[in-house]
Amino acid sequence: MAAAAMHTSAEFINLKPNMWKKNPVRASGSCCLGSSSGDEISRKRKLPILLFDVMDTIVRDPFYQDVPAFFGMPMKQLLECKHPMVWIEFEKGLIDEEELARNFFIDGRDFDLEGLKECMRSGYSYLDGMQELLQTLAADDFEIHAFTNYPIWYNIIEDKLKLSAYLSWTFCSCIAGKRKPDPEFYLEVVGHLGVEPCDCIFIDDRPTNVKCAIEIGMGGLCFENADSLAKDLSDLGINVSVPKL
């Protein structure tokens, strides 16, 4: 629940390394020369691996409309009253939800934590076309992981929307203790996967997060909507044919 950021930038939209333009998706192998014993493992995996941000990329984020309404105040007032760091600490798993409730507001006022969680749950929904796009990618045996800044409440999203039917909740900030765009978080991701950065494509609605992915060598796509993402993936050799995106 950080303050709203600029989500569009001509400088960062649809950034990707030139190699993805030149080389189609490979069913196996590693894109980087000189790999060691990891090659045998890589050859058994379908590449590239797809890393998806979740909020406002796959799932609607309730914070910008539903949460101000829940507290009965406009967004500007909410941002002025809210502690500037407590949600970030919650996303990094440094505090639990009880401490979030105690420190959410600068003045320490009480609020209905369970009501807020229900507000969030009610507001979670798939963005138009994204469930179908994920279903198509999963059916084509792509390896898909969530790579998200979100607290333990990702369990609420999973309970409602069942994203695990299409991806693994592998890289969550609340577990890693790090948030995008910290480069160390990205390096942990590729280290855990046992691949080179260039074997991954990262999709996120925030240009700063995409920029960091590209700087460490990943392919990067700045998400706008499901229709444009399907086109961008097709440009990279990943053909996504989803009706009525």
Swiss-Prot record:
InterPro entries: HAD-like_sf (IPR036412), HAD-SF_hydro_IA (IPR006439), HAD_sf (IPR023214). Optimum pH is 6.5-7.0 for both catalytic activities. It comes from Arabidopsis thaliana (Mouse-ear cress). This is Flavin mononucleotide hydrolase 1, chloroplatic. The gene is FHY1. One of its GO terms (cellular component) is chloroplast. Pfam families: Hydrolase. It comes from the Eukaryota. FMN hydrolase that catalyzes the dephosphorylation of flavin mononucleotide (FMN) to riboflavin. Can also dephosphorylate 5-amino-6-(5-phospho-D-ribitylamino)uracil, also known as ARPP. Not required for riboflavin biosynthesis in planta, but may help maintaining flavin homeostasis within chloroplasts.
